[in-house]
Amino acid sequence: MEDGAARNVAPVHPRPGPTPKAARERRVGCRAMHEILQAIGSGASGDDLAALSIPESYRAAFVRRDETGMWDGVESTDKDPRKSLHVDEVATPDLAPDEVYLAVMASAINFNTVWTSIFEPLPTFGFLDRLGRESVWGARHARDTHVVGSDASGVVLRVGSAVRNWKPGDKVTVHCNHVDDQDPTAHDDSMLATNQRIWGFETNFGGLADLSVVKANQLMPKPAHLTWEESACNALCNSTAYRMIVSSHAGAMKQGDAVLIWGASGGIGGYATQYVLNGGGTPVGVVSSPERAELLRGLGCEHVIDRREAGYKFWADENTQDEKEWRRLGKDVRALIGRDPEIVFEHPGRSTMGASVFVAARGGKVVTCAATSGYLIEYDNRHLWMKLKSIVSSHFANYREAWAANRLISEGKIQPLLSRVHPLTEVGDAALAVHRNEAEGKVGVLCLAPEEGLGIDDAEFREQVGEDRITLFRRHGS
């Protein structure tokens, strides 16, 4: 199946009572994946791994094209990812020359998986169909099932003929910037590439599976001191926070800058807090409970605002914002640090953007992504232009930024934010926890890894970094 003509094989749908042929294929696929897992667990060489058969199908979490209307008329908060995320066998795609087959040991839940599962703001099959029209290799993605997931750690099994820097047996993590490195628009900043996509959201064959196909320029070395699940939970949120806070493409934080961080105990917020602290800044973290405030202080953030205790109501009603509440937030920030923040780390979107623009310092900036509470944004432009503030958009990270962020994880300078772990069979429960904001940090998912705690190759360095630091969120989430 490698480097051949692409085939657009129909996926194996989850149906009761599989046909004898489908049942045989499933048994063969399970045996092949079991052999792969055994080989990885026994420390097989790269040559031995390369000699193993790639199964015709593999277990994956996916949504179905014929179910995209299942939530019609249902409020977003009432949509249950457990009903739309299926775990079953799907057909293995052919391998493009610039890709690798990856045995996925662990993955993680991100908001884009929640969006995919509730088909908001629109079903992702439109993304897959558009990719399918671009090339023969793109056509593989246009299926009636969408395998989701934008984080992964695992082991390279096979490499395409154009892959130079990776080989079977390499232990890797995966960042989600899916871009054609032969596209000239990708070479100033690949996030500006005309064909830039997020893997597992705007492409098929994502990381919530036992197997994946991944572009070689998505691969990064797995941190040797972390487990599979700890390694898998970082790339999307850590790289996003790095670009928003550190990179010259977005935040470009300086030593001494104050940064207001919404959702500071969450996925990207927890990484942002660490980057501000490491860079000599002053984080002001906004959280939603005393427990999360305590967790944030455990990261080293001294200045914390519990928004529920404060009772901010930035919207007087569905259509009207309340400037008095913006001012109250500004006073609370100044009471903590004595001034307005130079940077506001903004990702909730509609619910907070008006307040973010208001509280940013004169000449400061609001760095924004995601808009998880709503993407139709309102703010008072007078507070922007009259005080020379700026709004800077940021979307994930380019390869260099993702690599730098991953290096800081590998050096023990940034810690994983894993708070809970589910098996792949419970991916719906994991996505529901994120949808309902029930989990701090990141929610991990075990794929091929049979249990937590596996994959540590440098126990000595792990001890140097400190078990308490690495597992802070995990212990809090237990």
Give the role of each language-model region.
Residues H34-E56, R339, G354, Y399-S478:
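C-terminal hydrophobic helical "lid"/dimerization subdomain
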Residues I36-S53, T68-A106, D144-V147, A162-V163:
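A short N-terminal beta-strand-loop micro-motif at the entrance of redox/enzyme domains
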Residues A91-A108, P121-P184, P223:
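Glycine-rich beta-strand-centered segment in the early N-terminal region that forms part
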Residues G138-R143, S150, H178-G263, A310:
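NAD(P)H dinucleotide-binding glycine-rich loop of Rossmann-like/cofactor-binding domains
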Residues T240, I268, S351:
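Hydrophobic/small residue at the entry helix of a nucleotide-binding pocket
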Residues L277-S351:
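Adenosine-nucleotide cofactor-binding segment
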Residues A360-A361:
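Helix-to-beta-strand junctions that scaffold the AdoMet/dcAdoMet cofactor pocket
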Residues T372-M386:
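Rossmann-fold NAD(P)-binding glycine/threonine-rich loop
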